[in-house]
Amino acid sequence: MVLKIVFPGPLTTVQDFGRLGHQAEGFPECGACDKYSLALANLLAGNGSAPNMAGLEYTLAGPTVQADDYTLVALAGGVSRPKVNGKDAPMFAPILLAPGDTLEIGALESGLRGYLALFGGLDIQPVLGSRSTDLKCHIGGMEGRALRTGDALPVLSAFRLPQEQYALMQKHFTPLESWMLSTLTPHGYIGSAALPLLRIVPGPQDGMFTEQALHEFSHSLYTVTPDSNRMAVKLNGVAVKAKNGVDILSDGIVEGSVQISANGQPIVMLADHQSTGGYAKIGTVISCDIPAMAQVRPGQSVGFRFVTVEEGIAACKREKEKWNQFKEQFYGE
């Protein structure tokens, strides 16, 4: 089976959960910025035991694709109004494409990034253990680049024919609970605008900032700037003041690290983050809140709340438990 790219959209790449274990060699992890939504799309596409199957990540608008054979797909993440052969198709539900069918995902009406998963996953040659596209190193995915019109993506053969898997899933499928439609069950929202409040563990260089700066950071709104990308979300708001500057000897960076730049503005690392950095890190967004950060558009705002390591671990365990409960309900496992 092959999925043909009829129209790629602004930025569509092949992504899985990332190229783990190679930062010491200088390679970014890459992978989906919103791993929750990729996992959800995989679940809905029949890949329940493999939430990290390679699919497509698209930004602001999705691609138009054509199937050459029966193909089971699902969409999650940022919400659009997809169409199959010009007729409305669902988000957050299995979609069976027949030979020659065209799926047009269209512009996102909410969220920043969306995900297309396919039953069996994409049959892309792994590089360093991952099929994810690294746009900086030009490896993984389709020749290490964003997709173009005319690209043909092979789909792995699964353990069951797509049409059989679709029929089986339809017997058990019910509309998703509202919490599943979100990128996460958020800790909270700020005001009537429902701006995400992200939990952040202090450190490792939080001691470089004044107590007043830490308080202001965790009680202020920060707006996403237009120069944000898959590498990092750049924010603008109340400057975070350091005691004696923010430069440090470069040390390791992880997804969710919050650096404070020379002008006092926060930078939140995403999937394509560099392996080291020389700005002080005030904290790290907990892993189950990173998907929410990845879905905030330029011009929208977020807030932060400090939590302990133990609180962060407990929060992510609760999210994992909810996910497992839904998977059991959905697949009867």
Predicted segments with their positions:
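Conserved "landmark" site that anchors the functional core of diverse proteins
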Residues: 1-333
